[in-house]
Design a protein with these regions (language model features):
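Flexible "arm" and connector segments at domain edges
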Residues: 1-64, 68-126
Length: 126
């Protein structure tokens, strides 16, 4: 099965920043906390505009796909070019390395912005 650019970018980021894939509860909880963190940030910004089993993994995948799907639907409704925005955000995320090309981590493992960080330019997409 061919991977989409989003999948390739996610793998590239995790590889570059040495973030291992794991089904361990603690790792899953951490990843979920990042999704919640980003979701809360989206809700805040938008407000300014006015068990370990295959079945459980399947359900989690479905919910994650639903989240991505509704994000694409929101972007389409707003006339935003989400694919291009994702490419630019990915480039920005890949610029977080220190001068020695090593990542900077927060205590909980989140990759932080280094001195080479360049925020994505998205103004032309809105």
């Amino acid at each position: 099965m061919k991977k989409t650019f989003i999948s390739k970018q996610a793998k590239e980021f995790r590889t570059k920043y040495d973030i291992a894939n794991s089904r361990v509860q603690g790792i899953r909880s951490y990843q979920k906390s990042l999704i919640v963190e980003e979701f809360k940030e989206f809700i805040e910004a938008e407000g300014h505009l006015f068990r370990e089993s295959d079945k459980l993994h399947e359900e989690a995948l479905k919910e994650l796909a639903d989240l991505v799907y509704v994000c694409y639907q929101y972007a389409e409704n707003m006339g935003w070019f989400l694919d291009e925005a994702l490419c630019r955000v990915h480039e920005s995320n890949m610029s977080k390395l220190r001068e020695d090309c090593k990542p900077i981590y927060r205590e909980d493992g989140k990759v932080l912005k280094g001195p080479n960080y360049k925020p994505p330019y998205l103004q032309d997409l809105v």
